[in-house]
Amino acid sequence: MRIGSLFSGYGGLDMACQQYFGGELAWYSEIEPAACKILAAHNPGVPNLGDITKVNWAEVEPVDILTGGYPCQPFSQAGQRKGKEDERHLWPFVAVAIDALRPRIVVLENVRGHLTLGFGDVIAELSRMGYDARWGVVRASDAGAPHGRARIFIVAYLAGERLARDAAL
């Protein structure tokens, strides 16, 4: 399975998807210099599409799985929670990518505060595009991290594409 990654960061979400679903990273989209350097070192030959707001998705090879940890600042309890009014509100660009690429599976990650601001819009947009979504909150400490920050994970499947082994998701 081919995996595409938006807002890749240091690649943790991509690695988790590779381990769970199988497959290889086909491309990623990241602009932070330090993260780009690490991603390039760990994924030689895998192209970086750069700034998601400038990508022409009609020119990008489709993938089976699309991952994305889009910016949390618009939704975070630690910030001003401006939602759609925040210049870092980039969910609409993720939606454009999903609609153009039509991956079988979409895996998204964000802060728990997103549940009370903007989350309904994300789920409604996924549904409009023909995806069935499941979500849950996981504390970082549940995965062995030394802190308990909670993150929301959304797994969305194109209608009819859900894998039998993923019935618990």
Tell where the protein language model's regions lie, with residue ranges.
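A generic structural signal for ordered secondary structure
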Residues: 8, 14, 47-49, 118, ...
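Hydrophobic/aromatic anchor residues within beta-strands of the central parallel beta-sheet
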Residues: 26, 47-48, 106
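S-adenosyl-L-methionine
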Residues: 37-60
